[in-house]
C-alpha cells in the first residue's frame, strides 16, 4: 500500500486529468488506470477561472482523492496562493507544489520550491513537491517536512523516460518518505523501470492522454506499475560478466 501523509492508497499510479481528446476518453482512461489519486491544475478549475472548462466535470470525484497542483506558478508566493485557493474549495489539504523556473524546459525552481513547501507545511498542507533528480534538494525537502518527493524522470511531457536512473536510485535509497517519479514518462517500460528501481509510485498524464489509445495505455500503465513493483519486491538476479548455465550438466556424457 502507498501511504502519503497518513492516508493509504491501493494503487501506486497517480493520474493527471488534462490533455485528453474528450471527456468520455478521460473518464474511461481514469477507470482503466485503477488510480486512487487524480491530479489537476488549480488554474484550470472553472470555479476559479470563469469561462474555462472544468477538467473534473465528467468524473465521479467521490471515488478518488484529489491532488491539486500549482502548475503555472513562477514564485513561491504564486504557488502558495494557488494551494490556498484549492483548499478553500473544500477539496483537500494535499497539494503538489510545482514552481517552474524555465519556460522552455519546465524544470522546477529549487529555491522557490523550497520556500513554497516550507510555507505550506506551516499552513497544515500535505505537501508533495515536484523537483529535479538532485539528491541534496530532495533531502532538504524531506527535512522541511514534505510528505512525499516527486523527482522528474525527464522534462515534463517530453516522453524521454528515465534519463538518470542513478540519480533517482540515490533519492529512493536515502529518503524515508515516498518517492513518486513524476514527469517525462513515455511508455509502460519507463513505468516498470521506475518501479523496479524502488520508486513508491509514478505520476502520469501526457503518456496516457497523448497516446494513440488513452484507455488501452492507461491499462498498460496500471499493469506496468504492478509488474515493476512485484519485480522490485522479488529482487532481480545479480548481473554477471559471463554466462551461467541454467541447465544441470550432471549426467551428460562427453566424447
Swiss-Prot record:
Its EC number is 2.8.1.10. The keyword Lyase does not apply. Coiled coil: none annotated. It catalyses: [ThiS sulfur-carrier protein]-C-terminal-Gly-aminoethanethioate + 2-iminoacetate + 1-deoxy-D-xylulose 5-phosphate = [ThiS sulfur-carrier protein]-C-terminal Gly-Gly + 2-[(2R,5Z)-2-carboxy-4-methylthiazol-5(2H)-ylidene]ethyl phosphate + 2 H2O + H(+). One of its GO terms (biological process) is thiamine diphosphate biosynthetic process. Pathway: Cofactor biosynthesis; thiamine diphosphate biosynthesis. Signal peptide: none annotated. It comes from the Bacteria. It is found in: Cytoplasm. InterPro entries: Aldolase_TIM (IPR013785), Thiazole_synthase_ThiG (IPR033983), ThiG (IPR008867). The active site is at 96 (schiff-base intermediate with dxp). Keywords: Cytoplasm, Schiff base, Thiamine biosynthesis, Transferase. It holds the Pfam family ThiG. GO terms for cellular component: cytoplasm. 1-deoxy-D-xylulose 5-phosphate binds at residues 157, 183-184, 205-206. One of its GO terms (molecular function) is thiazole synthase activity. Transmembrane segments: none annotated. Homotetramer. Forms heterodimers with either ThiH or ThiS. Belongs to the ThiG family. Catalyzes the rearrangement of 1-deoxy-D-xylulose 5-phosphate (DXP) to produce the thiazole phosphate moiety of thiamine. Sulfur is provided by the thiocarboxylate moiety of the carrier protein ThiS. In vitro, sulfur can be provided by H(2)S. This is Thiazole synthase. It comes from Exiguobacterium sibiricum (strain DSM 17290 / CCUG 55495 / CIP 109462 / JCM 13490 / 255-15). The gene is thiG.
Amino acid at each position: 500500500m502507498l501511504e502519503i501523509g497518513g492516508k493509504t492508497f491501493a494503487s501506486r499510479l497517480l493520474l493527471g486529468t488534462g490533455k485528453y481528446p474528450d471527456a468520455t476518453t478521460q473518464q474511461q482512461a481514469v477507470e482503466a488506470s485503477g488510480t486512487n489519486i487524480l491530479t489537476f491544475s488549480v488554474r484550470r478549475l472553472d470555479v476559479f477561472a470563469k469561462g474555462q472548462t472544468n477538467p473534473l466535470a465528467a468524473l465521479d470525484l467521490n471515488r478518488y482523492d484529489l491532488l491539486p497542483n500549482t502548475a503555472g506558478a513562477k514564485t513561491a508566493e504564486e504557488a502558495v496562493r494557488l494551494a490556498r485557493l484549492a483548499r478553500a474549495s473544500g477539496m483537500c489539504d494535499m497539494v503538489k507544489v510545482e514552481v517552474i523556473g524555465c519556460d522552455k524546459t519546465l524544470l522546477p525552481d529549487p529555491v522557490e520550491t523550497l520556500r513554497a513547501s516550507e510555507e505550506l507545511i506551516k499552513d497544515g498542507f500535505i505537501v508533495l513537491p515536484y523537483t529535479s533528480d538532485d539528491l541534496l534538494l530532495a533531502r532538504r525537502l524531506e527535512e522541511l517536512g514534505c510528505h512525499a518527493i516527486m523527482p522528474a524522470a525527464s522534462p515534463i511531457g517530453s516522453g524521454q523516460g528515465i534519463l538518470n536512473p542513478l540519480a533517482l536510485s540515490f533519492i529512493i535509497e536515502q529518503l524515508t518518505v515516498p518517492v513518486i517519479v513524476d514527469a517525462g514518462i513515455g511508455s509502460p517500460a519507463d513505468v516498470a523501470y521506475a518501479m523496479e528501481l524502488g520508486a513508491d509510485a509514478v505520476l502520469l498524464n501526457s503518456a496516457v492522454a497523448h497516446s494513440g489509445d488513452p484507455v488501452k495505455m492507461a491499462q498498460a500503465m496500471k499493469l506496468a506499475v504492478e509488474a515493476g513493483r512485484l519485480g522490485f519486491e522479488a529482487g532481480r538476479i545479480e548481473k554477471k560478466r559471463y554466462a551461467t548455465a541454467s541447465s544441470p550438466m550432471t549426467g551428460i556424457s562427453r566424447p
